[in-house]
Amino acid sequence: TAASETKLIKGFGETVKELKEKGIGLYIVSGSIIEGIELVLGENVKYFDKIIANHFVFDKKGVISRINATKYDYEGKSVFASELIKKLDISPKELCFIGNGDNDEWVYKTGCRTICINPDGADFSNTVKWSRCIQQSDDFRDLLPIIESLEEENERE
């Protein structure tokens, strides 16, 4: 399957573990299928507070009968971010959203920090939509200094 052939970017597990150990909440909001996401994440799934995505619904014979679509794709990602900001009672700038596609670009409307990594359809040069951008990376750990610099900006503001 496509999910079983998908590999995580180098440094992914180390990065999410480090962020979690720092007390940072981690969420995945995706237009992909949750079963595939969980398969690709493997043991790293434990670091995420919540994963929201489309999911398969199976009939009694175990055949996929339909897909339950998440309401949190495209503009819905912005809705999710707004709901999370309210639920956690944080400033929008305390939320950092990481994405790479045009379906991720809506989140900037919440006022949260946004990082585009390995853009795939995203207008990564748009500094209104993206606080920071890593145009090409083969190591997820490249995000750590950027996240740290955003935290430092928050402390100064």
Task: Say what each PLM segment does.
Residues A53-F58, N118-F124, D138-R141:
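Short, acidic/turn-prone active-site loops that include or flank metal/cofactor-
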Residues S30-G31, E94-Q135:
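Acidic, Mg2+-coordinating phosphoryl-transfer loop and its flanking beta/alpha structural elements
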Residues F12-L41, D49-H55:
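Substrate-recognition element of Asp-dependent hydrolases with the DxDx(T/V) motif
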Residues D59-I64, F124-R132, L143-E148:
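Short, charged, surface-exposed secondary-structure boundary motifs
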Residues T1-G11:
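Metal-dependent phosphoesterase signature
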Residues I67-F80, S137-D142, L150-E157:
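A polyampholytic, Gly/Pro-enriched intrinsically disordered region
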Residues E75-E105:
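Conserved Lys-Pro-Asp/Glu-containing loop-to-beta segment of HAD-superfamily phosphomonoesterases
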Residues V45-Y72:
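Histidine/lysine/aspartate-rich catalytic loop segments that bind and position anionic ligands
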